[in-house]
């Protein structure tokens, strides 16, 4: 019985470590990823109204990700104060 409890504790610990490791390696990208990254990625993003693009790697493949324009924080504060 004690051996089964010990095995359960070890299993839970391993699962938690794997989840933590996966979250630590995750990258947050503020972008809309459309499809595979190729030479047409920039044209595709510009045709959809985006100003910037990047090729982001997810696990074993690379995707074309269109990034929305960044908003200046100071510009937003100035608009709120007026």
UniProtKB/Swiss-Prot annotation:
<feature type="disulfide bond">
    <location>
        <begin position="33"/>
        <end position="66"/>
    </location>
</feature>
<keyword id="KW-0295">Fungicide</keyword>
<comment type="similarity">
    <text>Belongs to the DEFL family.</text>
</comment>
<dbReference type="GO" id="GO:0031640">
    <property type="term" value="P:killing of cells of another organism"/>
</dbReference>
<protein>
    <recommendedName>
        <fullName>Defensin-like protein 75</fullName>
    </recommendedName>
</protein>
<dbReference type="GO" id="GO:0050832">
    <property type="term" value="P:defense response to fungus"/>
</dbReference>
<keyword id="KW-1015">Disulfide bond</keyword>
<keyword id="KW-0732">Signal</keyword>
<feature type="disulfide bond">
    <location>
        <begin position="41"/>
        <end position="64"/>
    </location>
</feature>
<keyword id="KW-0929">Antimicrobial</keyword>
<feature type="disulfide bond">
    <location>
        <begin position="45"/>
        <end position="65"/>
    </location>
</feature>
<feature type="signal peptide">
    <location>
        <begin position="1"/>
        <end position="26"/>
    </location>
</feature>
<keyword id="KW-0611">Plant defense</keyword>
<keyword id="KW-0964">Secreted</keyword>
<dbReference type="GO" id="GO:0005576">
    <property type="term" value="C:extracellular region"/>
</dbReference>
<feature type="disulfide bond">
    <location>
        <begin position="37"/>
        <end position="55"/>
    </location>
</feature>
């Amino acid at each position: 019985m004690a051996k089964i409890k010990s095995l359960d504790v070890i299993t839970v610990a391993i699962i938690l470590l794997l989840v933590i490791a996966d979250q630590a390696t995750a990258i947050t990208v503020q972008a809309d990823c459309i499809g595979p990254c190729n030479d047409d990625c920039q044209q595709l993003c510009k045709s959809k109204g985006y100003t910037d693009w990047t090729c982001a790697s997810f696990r074993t493949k690379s995707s074309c990700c269109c990034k929305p324009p960044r908003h200046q924080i100071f510009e937003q504060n100035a608009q709120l104060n007026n």
